[in-house]
Structure formats: C-alpha cells, structure tokens
C-alpha cells in the first residue's frame, strides 16, 4: 500500500498524464560500509521511483523487429534468470551482441541449448496452430507473457511451455515477442 501511494504521488508531482513508464527500484537500504552483506544495512529499504515519458514505436509494432541467436546464455550460474534485477550482465552482453549483429534483440538459449528468452522481451513461436514458449525456468515470467498464456488457455488456443531448439524457431509459422512496455511485437526475421 505504501509503494502504491508513493507511485501515485510521484506521478501526480511529475505532471505526467500519458505515456508514463515507471521504473521502480528497491534496494535493501543504506549500508554502513560498501560491503555487500545484508548485515551492514542501516534502516529500511530504499525505494526509487523514476517516471519517464516513453511510448512504444508504432512503426515497430506494425513492421516488427529482427532477432539473432546470440552466444550469451541465460542460466543460473550468474543469477536467477527469473528475477527482474538491475544486475543483468548477461542480458546486457546479449544486447551488445545483438547490436553488433545488426538486429533489435538477442535470442538467448538456456545452458542446454533450448530457447529461453530474448535479452529484454519474452519469446513465442506459432507452429501448426500451437503457441510455444519456453518452460519459464530461464526467463523472467513477465506480465505480458503471463497474459498471453492465460488468453490462449481462455480461448482454447493450444499453448505449450516447453523446451524447443533454434531449428524449431526457423521453421515456425509465426514468431513474436512480448514485453510490458511494448506489448506484443511481431518478429520479421531470426
């Protein structure tokens, strides 16, 4: 309830009333030394609320984006890939690699070589009337991803959370990505 009130107050004070994207950051709080142990925390958690004007590109929504499979993996070796954290070194590395390859997003594989997610969006394919997405073990189980899964179930569209390989992606009928900011975006090439 406190966070909700703080969000509402921040938006009101900012004067923003449309296309507002909120970045909410919560840390354990101030430290008595730069040591990382939670034992050194003084007081309550620190909450940072950053409102910014941000609008998803209509052109991107209509024309779609390009992907390439990157060498950077999503795995538990560095951090739990299901947590939305500022410490996303592997996602940043995948983003840099995608940029070097001249594409919009990097398609990331899990440690076993199965499709996991993209560096900043969730990944789906459509094959023979079925919608496929990763198992969720190596991706942030995002809000929009969850909505797509729920809607498929509600409307009787077969939705499979499963392991699949890049070859399945290349022979898919359709490919799309999802994110809370931009919604559902078509993928025009992988």
Over which residues does each language-model region extend?
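Conserved alpha/beta cores of soluble small-molecule-handling proteins
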Residues: 1-107, 111-112, 150-190
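Glycine- and Gly-Pro-enriched alpha-helical subdomains that act as flexible
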Residues: 106-107, 114-136, 141
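Feature captures the catalytic cores and cofactor-binding loops of soluble hydro-lyases/lyases
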Residues: 142-147
């Amino acid at each position: 309830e406190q966070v909700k009130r703080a969000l509402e107050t921040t938006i009101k004070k900012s004067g923003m009333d449309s296309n507002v994207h909120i970045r909410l950051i919560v840390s354990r709080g101030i430290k008595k030394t730069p040591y990382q142990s939670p034992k050194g925390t003084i007081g309550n958690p620190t909450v940072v609320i950053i409102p910014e004007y941000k609008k998803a590109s209509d052109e991107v929504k209509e024309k779609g984006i390009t992907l390439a499979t990157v060498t950077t993996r999503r795995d538990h070796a560095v951090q739990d890939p299901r947590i939305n954290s500022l410490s996303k070194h592997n996602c940043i590395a995948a983003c840099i690699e995608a940029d070097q390859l001249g594409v919009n997003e990097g398609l990331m594989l899990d440690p076993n070589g199965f499709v996991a997610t993209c560096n900043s969006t969730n990944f789906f394919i459509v094959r023979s009337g079925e919608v496929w997405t990763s198992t969720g073990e190596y991706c942030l189980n995002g809000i929009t991803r969850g909505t797509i899964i729920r809607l498929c179930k509600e409307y009787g569209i077969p939705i499979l959370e499963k392991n699949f390989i890049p070859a399945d992606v290349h022979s898919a009928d359709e490919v799309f990505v999802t994110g809370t900011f931009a919604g559902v975006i078509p993928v025009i090439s992988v």
